[in-house]
Each structure stands twice: as C-alpha cells, then as structure tokens.
A protein has these predicted regions:
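Ferredoxin-reductase
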Residues: 2-89, 145-147, 167-170
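FNR/FR-type flavoprotein reductase catalytic core
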Residues: 73-236
Length: 236
C-alpha cells in the first residue's frame, strides 16, 4: 500500500458556494495520471482519524496537486477541507490511486467525457492534460448539473468549444435548452460516433452513472469501452 505523505495547502480558489479547489504541495509526490484520485486523511487532536477519497483535478505538475472538494451534508472531511483548512496547514495524502478510469491523451484514442455534478473533477484533469500535451484527438465533454450555481471551472470551461452543458433544474437566462435530465438523444447528438478506438468516461453519482452507461451502450458503444467512476454521499 502506498504510504501517507504530508501535504501543505499553498493556494485555494472558490468554485461555487459549496466547493473550492485546493492546491497542495505533497512531499515526494511520485506523479499521477489524468483520472486518478487520492486518499485524504485528517487527524484530530485526540487522535481520531477520518479518511475520504478525492479525484485529482489537474495533471501532474512536480510536487503540486489540485483537488476540488464539494461540501456534503454532515461531511466531516469535506466540511473541513472546504471551510476549515487554511493556507500553510497540512493534511495527509495517499496515492495516486486507480488505473482503470484513466485517459492519457498522448497514448489513448478519442474520448467522450460525461460528468454529473462534481464528477467533472477527474474529467477536468483529462481536459487539462490534453491541452498541455497539445494533441488534437477528438474529445467531447457532456456536463450535467442542477443549475448554474453548481458549475465548476466556470471561466475555463466557457472557452471549451467541445462542451455541452445540460441543466436539470434551472438553466441560465437565454439557454436554448429547457431544464431536463440528460437524455440518450443528447448523448448521441453531442457525443462522438461509437468506434473501436473511442473510450467513454462517465463520472458522477451512482444513479447518474448507471443511467448514462446504459444509454451509451444502447446507442452503440461497446460496454468494454465505457469506463465509470461513481461516488455516494460519503464518497469523494
């Protein structure tokens, strides 16, 4: 098992009212791949410890990593990371973890990236890695969320021509799409044509992931080419 490493918070950036991005400097960080995640451990003064897993939001950059954390109700770890941890303070990190939900833009083929809510975090790592590598492999991003107030990486994604936003409860003024759940027809219209080279990556809450995965298979994507990452109330 990978050892725990000390990680110092060096910068923070608000994403929404309930989420922020943490930039951490990790001692002896070995590097990571787009789509991987880490385990975070907090230790209280009385010795009580709590652990949670969080996706990495950016590609490898020396000893720096980024995590985007959304506060969940009664979340003892997410609440502290969003509201309590201050620049200069330390937590413990273990990882990187995961080898299945990984897309390397320099090595792998085209990708359809589908995110629900905070499931955009590992997808963002993939997009940033693609931009950094300067490769032109076809990519489409479909990002489903409740309302504009839940949108992560607002400015960065606004400049992405390959992005389709699907709001389920409230849409911004002027949005031509009325609020509704993401449909199979939209996966077809805004995705990529199924092919042996294409891999689909789906990340979000369990119900969303199951629904989207089934829809992708129903429109012709090979089940083996649909990779998923899901989380629950006490997850990432």
């Amino acid at each position: 098992m990978t050892t725990w490493r000390a990680a110092e918070l060096v910068a923070v950036r608000a994403e929404t009212d309930t989420a922020r991005t943490l930039t951490l400097r990790v001692e002896r960080w070995p590097g990571h791949l787009p789509g991987q995640h880490v385990d975070v451990r907090l230790t209280a003064p009385d010795g009580y410890q709590a652990e949670r897993s969080y996706s990495l939001a950016s590609p490898a950059d020396g000893d720096l990593i980024e995590l985007t954390v959304q506060r969940v109700p009664d979340g003892e770890v997410s609440g502290y990371l969003v509201d309590g941890l201050e620049v200069g303070e330390r937590i413990e990190i273990r990882g990187p973890v995961g080898g299945w939900f990984v897309w390397n833009p320099e090595r792998d083929g085209p990708a359809l990236l589908v995110a629900g809510g905070s499931g955009i975090v590992p997808i963002m790592s993939m997009l940033r890695a693609r931009r950094r590598a300067g490769v032109g492999k076809p990519v489409r991003v479909i990002y489903a969320l409740r309302d504009p107030g839940q949108l992560f990486y607002r400015d960065e994604l606004a400049a992405d021509p390959d992005l389709f936003l699907a709001y389920s409860r409230a849409a911004p003024p002027g949005d031509p799409r009325p609020p509704a759940r993401l449909s199979g027809a939209e996966l077809t219209d805004h995705g990529l044509t199924p092919s042996p080279e294409l891999t689909c990556y789906v990340c979000g809450p369990t119900g969303f992931v199951e629904s989207v995965s089934a829809a992708l298979v129903s429109i012709g994507h090979e089940p083996a080419r649909v990779r998923t990452e899901r989380f629950g109330p006490s997850g990432r």
